[in-house]
Curated annotation (Swiss-Prot):
Gene Ontology biological process: base-excision repair
SUPFAM superfamilies: FMT C-terminal domain-like
Pfam families linked to this entry: Pur_DNA_glyco
Protein name per the record: Putative 3-methyladenine DNA glycosylase
MF term (GO), any: DNA binding
The species this protein was found in: Sodalis glossinidius
Annotated keywords: DNA damage, DNA repair, Hydrolase, Plasmid
Matching PANTHER family: DNA-3-METHYLADENINE GLYCOSYLASE
Family per record: Belongs to the DNA glycosylase MPG family.
InterPro entries documented for this protein: Formyl_transferase-like_C_sf (IPR011034), MPG (IPR003180), MPG_sf (IPR036995)
Enzyme Commission code(s) on record: 3.2.2.-
Length: 170
């Protein structure tokens, strides 16, 4: 059941794997769109070779080093945007990639894949570094849902594939 409560900074300022699992079943709101998060991946710090911050701080990865609860949106392959939410303490680069949602408003549609999700919702780099803990049309709402999930290797990467840091609702 959807609440009117937007997830707080303290929700995101925790261990990234815990945040990733706990985001499953929560409702992502962007503009007029609402969708239940059903698939995520965790990227954790400079020791994670698949994490964008593995090579350190750059202008592109600046958001990952910032405060928890902010968006980190980037472009891959020069054509697909990806939405992440920054986690853990400021200065430690970690984030959760939102890989899929079940859109239910204004239309019902399953969006599997971060590129499809961002394209349909029109999330772009203009939405980078947005505080998702504030009510401004781009946030994540709490729910009472605690879906069962499976943990699998992350996909679409060439390094760090040994980690079971992709979580998908069952």
């Amino acid at each position: 059941m959807l609440s009117n409560t937007i997830l707080s900074r303290s929700f995101y300022k925790r261990d990234t794997l815990c945040v990733a699992k706990d985001l499953l079943g929560k409702v992502l709101k962007f503009a007029d769109y609402y969708g239940v998060i059903n698939e995520v991946e965790a990227y954790i710090g400079q020791d994670d070779p698949a994490c964008h911050a593995a090579r350190g701080y750059t202008p592109r990865t600046a958001a990952m080093f910032g405060a928890a609860g902010f968006s980190y949106v980037y472009l891959i392959y020069g054509m697909y945007h990806c939405l992440n939410i920054v986690t853990e303490r400021e200065g430690f680069p970690a984030a959760v990639l939102i890989r899929g949602i079940d859109l239910y408003k204004p239309t019902v549609l399953s969006l599997n894949g971060p590129g499809k999700l961002c394209k349909k919702l029109n999330i772009t780099k203009n939405n980078n570094k947005i505080d998702l803990t504030q009510s401004h049309g781009f946030c994540v709402y709490n729910t009472t849902a605690r879906p069962e999930y499976m943990a699998t290797p992350r996909i679409g990467i060439k390094v760090g594939t040994d980690k079971l840091w992709r979580f998908k609702s069952m």
